UniProtKB/Swiss-Prot annotation:
The modification Phosphoserine is found at S753, S756. It comes from Rattus norvegicus. Residues 220-302 are annotated as: Required for interaction with CDH1. PANTHER family: ANGIOMOTIN, ANGIOMOTIN-LIKE PROTEIN 2. The keyword Oxidoreductase does not apply. It is found in: Recycling endosome; Cytoplasm; Cell projection, Podosome; Cell junction. Residues 177-190, 719-734 have a biased composition (Polar residues). The modification Phosphotyrosine is found at Y107. GO terms for cellular component: apical plasma membrane; bicellular tight junction; cell junction; cell projection; cytoplasm; cytoplasmic vesicle; plasma membrane; podosome. It comes from the Eukaryota. This is Angiomotin-like protein 2.
Length: 773
């Protein structure tokens, strides 16, 4: 019973510890009252009292201080993990890890605990009614009932057997250290090692184990190990909804009972869980011990596994702290690097601006220095000249004074002359001053002109750069034109190959037609020779007529395709002519605007002459580019026509339905007669005239037995894009009745009619090939 009391006391101690850490005062008092009742009940049932219970009851404040001191603070993994990690570790934090000296139970013990409490929970659900989980008296009553029921059954014999096995496995081990908390004897007992589990002091009906109970336990254990559907609760994949309900709704006073139900529900409906399901906490915090497994290696492996899990969790927390620290350092270094980069860019910009200012100031200083030197030289020259004038004036005055002294008579004349000379000198001096002012104005004009020349030089350089850029663009256009010319040559070669294939097909069809004519002649001779083979000859004649009809349908389909190509060619030619005219008008307008708005160069300066030559070259380049652009437009139109021809489906030539006959030269004549198409030359009309005459002569040369083939004409619409068929129904009817009428004629008439039809169609095909080329 000491073991049962230790387990229940340990659970209550841990709940009180959690409540003292996170709960309020009323719930803490309720838990302390429950612990006192449990200790009193355990002391009365076992016959022996705990000497430390009074200390524990009398001094709850000291125990609270010691519990808060001995509780290990979280290392940061609760705050560093995500929501999934917090959801996984909430049950683990509610049932804390044992202290360093506490011995962990084995897997067999934990399994026996869970099985026994599952059975007890099922019995309490069947026999008990609805209980209020929030009452303190109800919780203490439930715990007393659980302690009372543990004294019954076959737990006594099993506990004795497990005690013997544990003593044999561990030997006579002396408790080496005591707990640091003297107010809670449960912690001291758990750190001293496993207590000897004797039989309960009192309990009604002590009986032995049921037969074959260990075998059933081993079978359930093997089923739980081999079943892959159940995973440990420590894995991130095993998350049950009841854990969140327990954390959110159930108060921490009775969190222990809800944990019991959470661990018992999977055992009521399914095989036992994996051994790692109880890895996050000691099994004694969930249920009292009932069974222990006989092998000793599993205990060491379980403790090693738990120690490894603890080390992994500590390492994970340390790595997460290091990761956050490194992330903060990385953010700070990145901010510093960005600031340094901004400072470097600003310094570089300032240095460049300073260099440009230094260059401009040096130029300005050099210019000012030259002008100042010129002005100083001019002023020195004028000062020398003024000094000379003064010296001359002084000499004249001295000479005048000497003359007055020598001769008083002629002094007045000399004074007048000297006055006149002085007046002239004054005028000359004023003139020199005016010239100096003019020179100063000229200096200012030269300075302004130099600035204007610098601006013109910058503009000319910018225009030259733009001209070079346009030249590069136009060179790229020229390269594109060359590539398009190459593609055009390739398309022309492909079209020639296709025309050769069509010509071969035409010749093969003509050969087949000749063979059919020979067969018809043979059948005609056979029908004229004897009457015994009339049935077979009629069948062969019908078969030959069907073959001839099929060949005629193929020929008519080819003719229809050729007329369609002719119509597309005419449309593309008209569009190309329109595009070329538009491009020519646009180029002419650009030329006129450029010539009109071109700057008029002044022939007085060499700089303007250079600008004139550059503008002339630029205009020549633009005219050349306009010519190339017109050529590109023309070749683009030709390429579009060839691309439409290449996209033509070749399978349309072998259509099985009978299509109306369309005479190619008649269409061509109608197109020439229409005012919408003005692009044909007189040579094409002359080459087309014999073909129309042969077509017109073809039906006239046939015998009266064969119905004439009416000319099929097309009426062009106003925009030239649509055409309407004339007597298409009559033409199709005539073509449908043509093989029958040919069969009804004799051999010579049939041969002449087929030859004339073949000749006219070959001529039409040759004309169309020439037109397309």
């Amino acid at each position: 019973m000491r073991t049962l009391e230790d387990s229940s006391g340990t659970v209550l101690h841990r709940l009180i510890q959690e409540q003292l850490r996170y709960g309020n005062l009323t719930e803490t008092r309720t838990l302390l009252a429950i612990q006192q009742q449990a200790l009193r009940g355990g002391a009365g049932a076992g016959g022996t009292g705990s000497p430390q219970a009074s200390l524990e009851i009398g001094a709850p404040e000291d125990s609270q201080v010691l519990q808060q001191a001995t509780r290990q603070e979280p290392q940061g993994q609760e705050h560093q993990g995500g929501e999934t990690h917090l959801a996984e570790n909430r049950l683990y934090r509610l049932c804390p890890q044992p202290s360093k000296g506490e011995e962990l139970p084995t897997y067999e013990e934990a399994k026996a605990h869970s099985q026994y409490y599952a059975a007890q929970q099922a019995g309490s659900r069947l026999h008990g009614g609805d209980r209020d989980p929030r009452g303190a008296s109800g919780g203490s009553r439930r715990q007393d009932e659980a302690l009372r029921e543990l004294r019954h059954g076959h737990v006594r014999s099993l506990s004795e057997r497990l005690l013997q096995l544990s003593l044999e496995r561990n030997g006579a081990r002396v408790p080496s250290h005591m707990s640091s908390s003297h107010s809670f004897p449960q912690l001291a007992r758990s750190q001293q090692g496993p207590q000897p589990r004797g039989p309960p002091a009192e309990g009604p009906e002590p009986r032995g184990p049921p037969p074959q109970y260990p075998h059933a336990v081993m079978a359930q254990e093997t089923a739980a190990v081999n079943d892959p559907r159940y995973r440990p609760r420590s894995s991130p994949h095993f998350q049950h909804a009841e854990v969140r309900i327990l954390q959110a709704q159930v108060p921490p006073v009775f969190l222990q009972q809800q944990q019991y139900q959470y661990l018992q529900q999977p055992q009521e409906h399914s095989p036992p869980l994996h051994p790692a399901a109880l890895g996050h906490g000691p099994p004694s915090s969930f249920s009292p011990p009932a069974l222990e497994g006989p092998p000793g290696a599993q205990a060491t492996s379980g403790s090693a596994h738990l120690a490894q899990m603890e080390s992994v969790l500590r390492e994970n927390a340390r790595l997460q702290r290091d990761n956050e620290r490194l992330q903060r350092e990385l953010e700070s270094t990145s901010e510093k690097a960005s600031c340094i980069e901004k400072l470097e860019n600003e310094i570089q910009r300032l240095s460049e601006a300073h260099e440009s200012l230094m260059r401009t100031s040096s130029k300005r200083e050099a210019l000012e220095k030259t002008m100042r030197n010129k002005m100083d030289s001019e002023m020195r020259r004028l000062q020398d000249f003024n000094r000379d004038l003064r010296e001359r004036l002084e000499s004249a005055n001295r000479h005048l004074a000497s003359k007055t002294q020598e001769a008083q008579a002629g002094s007045q004349d000399m004074v007048a002359k000297l006055l006149a000379q002085s007046y002239e000198q004054q005028q000359e001096q004023e003139k020199l001053e005016r010239e100096m002012a003019l020179l100063r104005g000229a200096i200012e004009d030269q300075r302004r002109r130099a600035e204007l020349l610098e601006q013109a030089l910058g503009n000319a350089q910018s225009r030259a750069a733009r001209a070079e850029e346009e030249l590069r663009k136009k060179q790229a256009y020229v390269e594109k034109v060359e590539r398009l010319q190459q593609a055009l040559g390739q398309l022309q070669a492909a079209c020639e190959k296709r025309e050769q294939l069509e010509l071969r097909l035409r010749t093969r069809l003509e050969q087949e037609l000749k063979a059919l004519r020979a067969q018809q002649r043979q059948t005609g001779t056979l029908t004229g020779g004897g009457g015994s083979h009339t049935g077979s000859t009629e069948l062969s004649a019908l078969r030959l007529s069907e073959q001839l009809r099929e060949k005629e349908e193929q020929i008519l389909a080819l003719e229809a395709d050729m007329t369609k190509w002719e119509q597309k060619y005419l449309e593309e030619r008209a569009m190309r002519q329109f595009a070329m005219d538009a491009a020519a008008t646009a180029a002419a307008q650009r030329d006129t605007t450029l010539i009109r708005h071109s700057p008029q160069p002044s022939p007085s300066s060499s700089f303007n002459e250079g600008l004139l030559a550059g503008n002339h070259r630029h205009q020549e380049m633009e005219s050349r580019l306009k010519v190339l652009h017109a050529q590109i437009l023309e070749k683009d139109a030709v390429i579009k026509v060839l691309q439409q021809r290449s996209r033509k489906d070749p399978g349309k030539a072998t259509q099985g339905t009978l299509r109306p006959a369309k005479s190619v030269p008649s269409i061509f004549a109608a197109a020439v007669g229409t005012q919408g198409w003005q692009g044909f030359s007189t040579s094409e009309r002359q080459t087309d005239a014999p073909a129309r005459q042969t077509v017109d002569r073809g039906p006239a040369e046939e015998p009266p037995a064969t119905p004439p083939l009416p000319a099929h004409t097309k009426h062009g619409s106003r925009d030239g894009s649509t055409q309407t068929d004339g007597p298409a129904d009559s033409t199709s009817a005539c073509l449908a009745s043509e093989p029958d009428s040919l069969l009804g004629c004799n051999g010579s008439q049939r041969t002449t009619s087929l030859d004339s039809i073949a000749a006219t169609r070959v001529q039409d095909l040759s004309d169309m090939v020439e037109i397309l080329i």
